[in-house]
Amino acid sequence: MTWAYFRPGGVIDAGARLNPDGTIAEWEFHNYNSGPSGLQTPYEVGSKKEHQHQSKSPLRQSSYRGLAATANHFARECYMDELAHSIQMDPLEFRLKNAKNERLRNVIQAAADKFGWKSRKKTLGRGFGISAGFEKGGYVAACAEISVTHGAVKVVRVVEAFECGAVVNPEHLANQVEGAVAMGLGGAMFEQIDFADNKIITNKLSHYRVPRFADMPVIESVLLDRKDIVSAGAGETPIVGIAPAVGNAIFDATGQRIRSLPMAPKGLPAGAGSSSSMANGG
């Protein structure tokens, strides 16, 4: 593990100005180091500035499933939630208001309908989150339900809708979506490399926390089949929805906005999330 390449770490800054009706008038998004994949917002905005800034890393960097789209979607979709809450608008309605692309709207609505978003019931220690996005020709939306007990976060249920054009092999596609959710859960909640005194101290696989059977939620996939659209890949895009959906659910349950990955490797930190910057740990 001390020799391996690392997913690029990065810092992401996001900013926006809203119109009185809740549409996005101005949008600004900067990714430092982790990459440009998934950088561009899929939402309709009045004007935008979106840039990826390269920087030198002390670590050897390489690819992660979905590349930087995992980090960019985490930052953007959590920030979309912040914007929705700032004007007291439901996060689903806020996304639909700003989503003009038919395919994006379809996956958002499909995930919300299957999840039962409008009939969700808020109880103590229970939270619900939603996210959406686009990458590599595919559109994805995820809804997550989590529970929090004494700082320990349990992802209870995930519904993910995915559309990548014409579906050729439905069973294999469902496996890709569900596998991406499982892998994305690890990056969202647990997986990290720790350093001390310029050395890697997570130097054994037994010290590297990955999702266990007990961590796995109920996963439901909704596959939208568009026979009128040429098939796109499905191996990477489904991973981008899980982290922001869980992050938004944690906020819904606790009022804590966590802005770095992984979010809760050892439970929720006290007073998490006080900055407007989003960071992705490799």
What would you call each of these model-derived segments?
Residues M1-G282:
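Cofactor-binding beta-sheet edge motifs in enzyme active sites
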